[in-house]
Amino acid sequence: GLVPARAATAGETFPKRPGRLKQGVCRGVFRGVKLDNDQMCREAAKVGAWGIDLVGPDFFPSLKKYGLIPTMLPGGSGIKAGINDPKHHAEIEPKMRQALKDAAAVKAPNVIVLAGDRAGLSDQQGMDHCVTFLNRVKAQAEDLGVTLCMELLNSKVNHPGYMCDKTAWGVELCKRVNSPRFKLLYDIYHMQIMEGDIIRTIRENIAWIGHFHTAGNPGRNEFDETQEIYYPPICRAIADLGYQGYFS
């Protein structure tokens, strides 16, 4: 059934979208739209979202006002300058540690991690550097109860050179880090471009997945008849696996 959100103003409530998956939205869906934080949160609440991904502490008051949570916080790493290159570690680490504290303070479940550009590094070298970094911060994530999620992105169309572009690479990284608080952010749009075979891949690797992102393909558009990804069976498969995280 519908779960009422917390009152936003006197007498104003919004129901959560019904279903077995807790749906959220990414901040990026509001790109190009002139809305302040409060307006963005209200729009997200109106469509039944549980929260918004990739927002920081400046959003926390508005999220709380509309009964939302920050489903994933930025963690200081970047698509180009990520944790696969040790020259970025000193800059990223304090930002990630602060993001973990911020997340714990508001009971946000996740902080995003980005591998970074290959930039001449082999996949093995990059993974070794990621393991070194994550082994330094994983204890804090475990102590605070916040999950670090490494995003899988496509290197074919949107992010040439991005290292964590295959599920198998991400899963191997998870196994090496060996922490219940390090998982993958499985982006269905990006992995459709890189691998396809979405449902089988998710079923085989759900233990390593902490969060999902979605979009249509081609063109990262809305889920309509122009897009090749048919989401209903994907969503059913994820729900049937007992997934308890967020789907944004």
Predicted segments with their positions:
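Active-site-adjacent beta->alpha loops and helix N-cap segments on the catalytic face
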Residues: 57-68
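Active-site acidic/histidine proton-transfer and metal-coordination neighborhood
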Residues: 2-4, 15-17, 81-183, 193
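Conserved beta-strand positions in the central sheet of alpha/beta enzyme cores
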Residues: 51-53, 72-74, 112, 149, ...
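Histidine-acidic metal/acid-base catalytic patches
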Residues: 1-47, 107-109, 164-186, 190-248
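Short, hinge-like loop/turn segments at secondary-structure boundaries
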Residues: 69-73, 88-90, 129-130, 166-168, ...
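Active-site-proximal loop/turn and secondary-structure-junction residues that shape catalytic pockets
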Residues: 29-31, 56-58, 76-79, 117-119, ...
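Short, conserved active-site loops that position catalytic residues or coordinate cofactors/metal ions
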Residues: 66-68, 72-78, 115
